[in-house]
Regions:
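The catalytic Nudix box helix
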Residues: 33-65, 104
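A conserved beta-turn-beta hairpin within the catalytic core of GNAT-like acetyltransferases
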Residues: 26-30
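Generic C-terminal helix-cap and adjacent flexible tail
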Residues: 1, 125-132
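Active-site-adjacent beta-strand/loop module that shapes the phosphate/pyrophosphate-binding cleft
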Residues: 69-91, 101, 124
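Conserved N-terminal beta-strand and adjoining loop/helix that marks the start
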Residues: 1-17, 37
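NUDIX/MutT-family hydrolases
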Residues: 84, 93-124
């Protein structure tokens, strides 16, 4: 089975977490933490900065490395590096997603996330409880 390595941004603003809704593929309409695949020779940190610029036309600053999770989808194995980030600019544009919103940490369990993204929820809750 093929392994795909990605990075995701857990962007927190005023105690709320930024999530995006997929507009394509088998998991269309599911929610996720924005990010994408590492390019050859690229670090997970460089990947997340690039992906957020490509997907949202926004600049971010990485605050800290949150976690890495692994999940096996039917056709590939995913390794996802998760970073706590903050927006450096107030402007964002949805270039690849159907929708986006900031949600309260208490809402996370009720959102229809992609299977791999669900595995990050406990790490996010712990990070917020410890004030990052």
């Amino acid at each position: 089975m093929k392994t795909v390595t990605v990075s995701s941004a857990v962007t927190i603003k005023d105690g709320k977490i930024f999530i995006t809704q997929r507009g394509y593929g088998d998991y269309k309409d599911k929610w996720e933490f924005p990010g994408g695949k590492l390019e050859k020779g690229e670090s997970p940190e460089d990947c997340i900065v690039r992906e957020i610029k490509e997907e949202l036309d926004a600049d971010i600053r990485i605050i800290k490395y949150l976690s890495a999770i692994e999940y096996s989808y039917p056709t590939f194995h995913l390794i996802m590096h998760n970073f706590v980030c903050e927006l450096k600019s107030s402007y964002m544009s949805l270039l690849e997603h159907e929708a986006a919103k900031f949600v309260d940490v208490n809402e996370l369990d009720s959102i229809d996330f992609l299977p791999a993204d669900k595995l990050v929820l406990e790490d996010i809750k712990k990070a917020i409880e410890s004030h990052l």
